[in-house]
Swiss-Prot record:
GO terms for cellular component: cytoplasm. GO terms for biological process: methylation; tRNA processing. It holds the Pfam family MTS. It is found in: Cytoplasm. Coiled coil: none annotated. The keyword Nuclease does not apply. The keyword Methyltransferase applies. Keywords: Cytoplasm, Methyltransferase, S-adenosyl-L-methionine, Transferase, tRNA processing. This is tRNA1(Val) (adenine(37)-N6)-methyltransferase. HAMAP family: tRNA_methyltr_YfiC. It comes from Aliivibrio fischeri (strain MJ11). It catalyses: adenosine(37) in tRNA1(Val) + S-adenosyl-L-methionine = N(6)-methyladenosine(37) in tRNA1(Val) + S-adenosyl-L-homocysteine + H(+). Specifically methylates the adenine in position 37 of tRNA(1)(Val) (anticodon cmo5UAC). GO terms for molecular function: nucleic acid binding; tRNA (adenine-N6)-methyltransferase activity.
Length: 234
């Protein structure tokens, strides 16, 4: 596993936290609507990827990043300190479910855990990052509800099966599904991921499909979405 990953405007050191830079994370960070946001919350920050992408995309936003695992929190703090936006990035080493703040967030971003205990055998912090036991969907959504503004948007990425369950739970927590993008690796394959946007306010619903690869490599849509981050992407 590579211990670092360089993007166009920032660098991610992975260190020993066991959380590699993933396509899921890049997709979510590029897809999330943060254009007019001033307060952004990154839940389960890991190496800090989503926070750094948000800071690059929105030059006015203050970003709080919550991370429970000590090693990952230190890695994220290091990555923030080495970025051009360190004044706007705050690492909070805390359990999300106990986190409280005096202000509301315009945007919440989260790449949630999705393996139930026993489904996947991983080690250390990577295991914790991927098991729902550490942050169950219902508790995650209920606490998001207390932190998001009335018109704010919360964005997530999940595998299709888990994503459909997540959406049902979200509706039970008074969230509206406002945007969904079904992600396919190639045109002929079924979707493998869902990019999900929720809000307490019923915005106009949008649905789309994103294909990552075409016959010539990366698809035009994927390049358009991620080109401001990936090196050699145009």
């Amino acid at each position: 596993m590579s211990k670092s990953f360089t993007f166009k405007q920032f660098h991610i050191d992975i260190g020993s936290c066991g959380m590699p830079v993933s396509t899921d994370g890049v997709l979510l960070g590029a897809w999330t609507n943060i254009s007019e946001c001033s307060q952004i919350l990154d839940i389960g920050a890991g190496t800090g990827l989503l926070s750094l992408m948000s800071a690059q995309r929105n030059s006015n936003a203050h970003i709080d990043a919550i991370e429970l695992m000590p090693i990952a929190a230190e890695v994220a703090r290091l990555n923030f300190s080495q970025s051009p936006w360190k004044e706007r990035l705050v690492l909070i080493h805390q359990d999300f479910l106990s986190y409280q703040t005096a202000y509301e967030y315009d945007a919440i971003i989260c790449n949630p855990p999705y393996f139930n205990n026993g489904e996947q055998s991983l080690k250390g912090e990577r295991s914790t990052a991927r098991h729902t036991d550490s942050l169950p969907f219902d508790k995650l959504l209920q606490h998001c509800k207390t932190l998001i503004s009335s018109t704010g948007r919360a964005s997530f990425i999940l595998p299709v099966f888990e994503g459909e369950i997540f959406i049902k739970i979200a509706k039970g927590c008074d969230f509206h599904l406002t945007k969904i993008t079904k992600v396919k690796t190639t045109e002929k394959k079924s979707p493998t991921r869902l990019l999900i946007e929720l809000s307490l306010f019923p915005h106009i619903y949008q649905e789309s499909t994103l294909t990552i690869h075409d016959g010539n490599g990366y698809s035009d849509d994927f390049i358009k979405l991620t080109r401001m981050f990936y090196l050699n992407m145009g």
